[in-house]
C-alpha cells in the first residue's frame, strides 16, 4: 500500500500469498498433469460420480496419422469443457477417446516407407506395417490431447482396428445386408485415379480448376419418327449440338438427352442445321462467336426427337436420343452428352432406355481400347488430343476456357472422375424416410443443423461403401466359384464376426474362403459350395459410423443412444451422417439425442490456414509461449458455432484477459492469508451492505455461468467471469475494501474475508471446466473446510439463490454505484486542477434531494467514505456542487481537512490523539495498540 517505508508497515495486513502473479503455465502445467496421472484423476472422478445420472458425449474419432492442429485442439477442448462441467453439475460424464485407424492416408504412408519393396510385399505384411504406423500416432496424439488438459480414458481408447470393434462392425454390416439395405451393383462413383479407389461423397473436396468447355455436333443418322422430314430439314445436313466440360468422356458417349418439355429449334448455319434448345440459341451462338445464323421453322417439342439416332463423333457406332428431366436451361445447349459410365444422371437415364453403359477408363485413369486411338492416354491428357482431333474434323462448333469448381480427392488432393464400377452400396433410398423421422427427434445445435442434415440426406445418392484398397475392414462377402453370385447369410456374418473378434480382420487375409465360411453353406443360385472371398474393404466412414454399436453398446460406462455427438461442420456429410445412416438402418433410430457443431479455425484475417501461406498456428507453439490454459481460454472466449480466428495477436490479447482473472484470484488469496474458514467466517448479519452486494453479484455470475454452460455457450461464461473479475471485483469491491482489509483486525475485516472466500470458492468452480490448470492451482492455495475435495473438478458447481438479493437491494446499489461514478468524475477534475492528488486527500460534499439523501444516509458515513475512497463524506440536503447524471445529486470536492495518517493515509482531525502514536489517527492507533 505505502510507497515509502514507514515504521507502521509491519502493522498493516498487506496481501501475502505464494500464488504467483506470473502464471508460468508452460512449466507448471506438466507437473499438474503428472499429478493427475499419478492419482488417476479421470477414473477417480468417474467413481466419485458413480450412481449419478449419466451424460454420454461420444467422441468422434480423429484420424491417427499426424500431430494435432488448432482445429483438433478446438474440438477436444470443447468436449473437455463439457465433460468437466457435466461431472460438476451432478452427472457421471465419462469420456472415452477414439481413433480412426484404417484408410488410405495410412496405407499410402506405409507404402511410401517401403520404397521398391512395396512391389513384393503381401497384403498381410502391408496391413501389419499400417497397424504399427497407426498405433504410434495414437500414442503421440493422446499425449498431445492430455497436454491440453483433456481428461478421459486414454489408457483404454476405442480404436477402429481393435478386433472387438471390427467384429461389431461386421455385425452391423450383416444386420443391414439382412434387411436388404446393402447391395452390390454397377454404378458411377467418385473415383480417384491416383489412389485407384472409389470414394464416398464425404471424401470429396472442391477446388477451382481450368478447363475447356466445348460445343460438339453429332451428325443425325436415323429419324424413325420422321421429325426432320415433317419440318423439311435434310437429315444428311443435321446435327445435335451438345456442350461438355469433360472432353475425355466423349468416347463413352452412347446417348444425347433432351428434355421432353422444352422447345427445340433448327438453327441454320451456312447449309447445315443444328438442333438446340430454343431458349439457349443466342447464348450458344454468342459462345461460339457465330453471328450469321437463322432459326428455321417453328420450335419443336423435345419429346418428338425421342429415339432418333446419330453417329458418334469419331468411333464407328451410333447413339440414341433420349429424354430426361435432369436436362435444364441453365447452361449448355439443352442437348446433354450422355455417358452412363461417367455420371449418375447419365447412368439412371441410360438404364431407363437400356442404353449401353460404356466405361473406357481403367483404374488408373487411362483410356482403354474402347476409346479407340486414344487408348493408353490419361484422361487429362486425352482432353487436349481429342479436342485437337475433333476441331480438325469440324466437329467442334465453339470452345470457351472456363474456371469452375471441380471435385478433388481429399486424400491426395488431385482431380477425380466419375466412373461406373461394380461396388458395394448402402441403399439410402430404401430407408430415407426413416432417416428423416430420426433427424426430427434430435436436438441440433445450432438449430440450422436440422435442415442441413435433412437436405444432405434428401440430395444424396446411395452410399458407396467399398474401397479397392488393403488397409481396412474387409467386405465380409463370399463368391460362388461356379456362378459368381455373392453370398452373405446370418451364418457367414456370425462366422466372420467370431473370427475377427478372436484374431482381428487380418484373419481374412490369412485364411482361404473355405477355412472361414461355415460348413454346409451352399450357393442360393446354383447350389455349389466352392468359394472365393471379396477383395474390397469398407469405407472408413462405415468404420466410424459403426461406433454406436462397437463402442456405445459395448463399453459398460457408456450407453446408446449417446446424449451428444460434437464435431466440426464438415461432419454433416461425414461422421454425423454415416452414424445416422447405419444406426437408422440397423436399429431404426438416431445414435444421438443431440448434435453440437463447431466451425473451422481460420487465421486472424479470417483466411484458411495453410503451411504454404505461413499463416498457421500450432498448438505446441502456443503451449510453449503461454500454456494450454490460454488455448482453453481462446476456445471459451470464441463463438465456436462459426469460424474461429486464431493468431499470435489474439493469444497475446487473451493472455492479458487471463492475467486479470488470475490477479483477481491472487488478490483474494493474498487477503486470505491466515484466514481459517472453519473458525473465522462471520454470520450473514455481520456483513456490510457492500459485502452483500458482492455476494449478490456472485449470484448473478452463478446464474449467467450456468445459463452459458447449459447451452454450451462458453463465450457467455467467459464474458460473465471476465466482467465479474474486472468490473465488479477489481474495479469496485476489492478496491473499496482495501482499507478494511489492510488497516483493521475486527469483524469488518473478517466480513470482507468471509465474502472474498465465498466468492473465490465459487468463482474457481465456475472457471474449472475452462481453466483446468489455473483453477486447480487456485484450489491448492485456498484454505479448506471439511468435505472439500483435493481436486476442484470433484466439486459441485455452485447453486444459484444462496446469495441472491431482491430487486430493491439491487436497485439501491445500482444507484449507489452511479453516485460513486459521479464522485469519481469530480475527483478526476480536482486532480487535474491539482487541488488533490490521491483520492484519499479529498473530502466530498454531496448535495441531495430527499430521495438521494435517504439513499446515502442509509449507509454508515465511514462505509460511504470507503465506497467513494475518500477521507470524508458530508451529506447536505439541497442544491449545490457540480451537476451530475444522477437526478437530485450535486457533487463538490475539496482537499480534506486535518492531517494525513501515516498508516492508513486518510486525513483526519484526530491525528495524534494517542500520545504514543502522534502520526496516527485514533482508529489506527487503537489497532496498533491492540
Q: Model-flagged regions — what are they?
A:
Residues 196, 468, 484, 527-528, ...:
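Cys/His-coordinated zinc-binding microdomains
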Residues 145, 168, 463, 656-669, ...:
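Core structural elements
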